[in-house]
Amino acid sequence: MVLLHVKRGDESQFLLQAPGSTELEELTVQVARVYNGRLKVQRLCSEMEELAEHGIFLPPNMQGLTDDQIEELKLKDEWGEKCVPSGGAVFKKDDIGRRNGQAPNEKMKQVLKKTIEEAKAIISKKQVEAGVCVTMEMVKDALDQLRGAVMIVYPMGLPPYDPIRMEFENKEDLSGTQAGLNVIKEAEAQLWWAAKELRRTKKLSDYVGKNEKTKIIAKIQQRGQGAPAREPIISSEEQKQLMLYYHRRQEELKRLEENDDDAYLNSPWADNTALKRHFHGVKDIKWRPR
């Protein structure tokens, strides 16, 4: 199995294994799905952290309004009355004005937070350092865990306009957002390795050979964005260590230049006649009377 270290730009994303005989059409779609799936889990975790703190989303026509404005316009949050967290709600106002402030109690909040941490760990970039490959099954498992936690805390479900429910139903609208720019459509995804595009019409082995123990750094890119930057010769960590070494060396040389003390000339090892006296047997002669 060829090991692919998938990156976006210079940032590590995940590890993935594939046989050398894999069609690049299939592999590119697979990489794009895992990449986008990880982004989906990250978006859900971010929104669920807000859900744990401030409750469900307000209706779009009530978001950003003050209590006085809501009362003046006679607006009512009907879904807020239906979607009550299990065990009762604790009021915690959302300063941004996106959520209704009816947060879950401490026990239910911990259910959400613990599940969020577990889901983050599954798709974490630290999996690269640990040598763990991320598969679509793992991404789906993380999504299922998040869905289950929401169902436990909100047995009556979430409003249809809540971004968490929309994510679970694949109805999310990311147009005009930074999150939307990060997503790469499967049909427009490209894989690059060694400054070459891995064309979908070929097999992986056409580029990396038939050695199944090969490890490559593959960069995922949106079509039309051009070739990604080449990998640096040394990593950022190695560069830091190199700079630190030269800085220490420079400081050491600087101290030696400043130290013009010649007291070392009185040391035995600095005496150029010591060897001669040693062979003549006059090494430890003292001229003073005892």
Swiss-Prot record:
Which keywords does this chain's UniProt record carry? Answer: Cell projection, Ciliopathy, Cilium, Cytoplasm, Cytoskeleton, Kartagener syndrome, Phosphoprotein, Primary ciliary dyskinesia
Which PANTHER family does the entry mention? CILIA- AND FLAGELLA-ASSOCIATED PROTEIN 298, PROTEIN C21ORF59
What organism does the UniProt record list as the source?
A: Homo sapiens
**Biological process GO annotation list?**
cilium assembly; regulation of cilium movement
Q: Does the keyword Phosphoprotein apply?
A: yes
Q: Where in the cell is it found?
A: Cytoplasm; Cytoplasm, Cytoskeleton, Cilium basal body
Q: Subunit arrangement?
A: Interacts with ZMYND10.
What name does the UniProt record give this protein? Cilia- and flagella-associated protein 298
